[in-house]
């Protein structure tokens, strides 16, 4: 199995490139985001490879980071998602944004990808939420966000209502969870929704 290729970009197609490795041209399928990140024709490139072997063909899928490849693998484990849809998702969301969308349960962000409807978006969140911590370890900001989301969702009640209120005011889910988690730490367990919203808005105004 091929795990990594290092060579020279020979040409680009709509959803792939030809990578010349010592005179052998490998056709590698990529997400739109990966194709945009690659250097120009004639320049050196390195791709992490996922190899799919079928009875009638061998297909290579390339990624600029191992995290992107791992998300590609995880996404295909979900009913209704094949290689085409997985690449469409990775074309729309970079790995850190995908992890954030799953952690926040942001189905709208996921549904922006071609081929992802409400049901598939829901399955992505439900089935991959437990996998997000593995991707947050190397990203302190994302790790804090995941912890804040877990704290507000586990507590429920006033915290959850306060998050919902901030989202309704137009703040993003990540902003709302982070602000209300900070407000909750300051106000304590018995804080009312109104108090949390007030403190949360102060956090957002900093």
Curated annotation (Swiss-Prot):
SMART domains: HhH1
UniProt keyword Transcription, yes or no: no
Stretches for region Domain II: 65-143
Pfam families membership: HHH_5, RuvA_C, RuvA_N
Subcellular location: Cytoplasm
Domain I as annotated region, ranges: 1-64
Keywords: Cytoplasm, DNA damage, DNA recombination, DNA repair, DNA-binding
Annotated region (Flexible linker), positions in chain: 144-154
GO molecular function: ATP binding; four-way junction DNA binding; four-way junction helicase activity
Domain notes: Has three domains with a flexible linker between the domains II and III and assumes an 'L' shape. Domain III is highly mobile and contacts RuvB.
Oligomeric and partner information: Homotetramer. Forms an RuvA(8)-RuvB(12)-Holliday junction (HJ) complex. HJ DNA is sandwiched between 2 RuvA tetramers; dsDNA enters through RuvA and exits via RuvB. An RuvB hexamer assembles on each DNA strand where it exits the tetramer. Each RuvB hexamer is contacted by two RuvA subunits (via domain III) on 2 adjacent RuvB subunits; this complex drives branch migration. In the full resolvosome a probable DNA-RuvA(4)-RuvB(12)-RuvC(2) complex forms which resolves the HJ.
Chain's role: The RuvA-RuvB-RuvC complex processes Holliday junction (HJ) DNA during genetic recombination and DNA repair, while the RuvA-RuvB complex plays an important role in the rescue of blocked DNA replication forks via replication fork reversal (RFR). RuvA specifically binds to HJ cruciform DNA, conferring on it an open structure. The RuvB hexamer acts as an ATP-dependent pump, pulling dsDNA into and through the RuvAB complex. HJ branch migration allows RuvC to scan DNA until it finds its consensus sequence, where it cleaves and resolves the cruciform DNA.
Protein's UniProt name: Holliday junction branch migration complex subunit RuvA
Native organism: Azorhizobium caulinodans (strain ATCC 43989 / DSM 5975 / JCM 20966 / LMG 6465 / NBRC 14845 / NCIMB 13405 / ORS 571)
């Amino acid at each position: 199995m091929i795990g990594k290729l290092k060579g020279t970009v020979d040409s680009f197609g709509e959803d792939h490139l030809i990578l010349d490795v010592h005179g052998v041209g490998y056709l590698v399928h990529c997400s739109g985001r990966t194709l945009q990140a690659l250097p120009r024709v004639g320049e050196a490139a390195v791709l992490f490879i996922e190899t799919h072997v079928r009875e009638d063909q061998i297909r290579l899928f390339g990624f600029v980071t191992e995290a992107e490849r791992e998300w590609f693998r995880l996404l295909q484990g979900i009913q209704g998602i094949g290689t085409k849809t997985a690449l469409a998702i990775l074309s729309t969301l970079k790995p850190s944004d995908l992890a954030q969308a799953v952690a926040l349960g942001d189905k709208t962000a996921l549904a922006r990808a071609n081929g992802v409807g409400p049901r598939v978006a829901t399955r992505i969140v439900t089935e991959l939420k437990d996998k997000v911590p593995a991707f947050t370890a190397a990203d302190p900001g994302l790790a804090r966000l995941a912890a804040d989301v877990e704290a507000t969702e586990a507590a429920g009640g006033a915290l959850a209502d306060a998050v919902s209120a901030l989202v309704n005011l137009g703040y993003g889910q990540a902003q709302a969870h982070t602000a209300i988690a900070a407000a909750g730490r300051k106000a304590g367990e018995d804080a009312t929704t109104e108090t949390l919203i007030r403190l949360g808005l102060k956090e957002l105004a900093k």
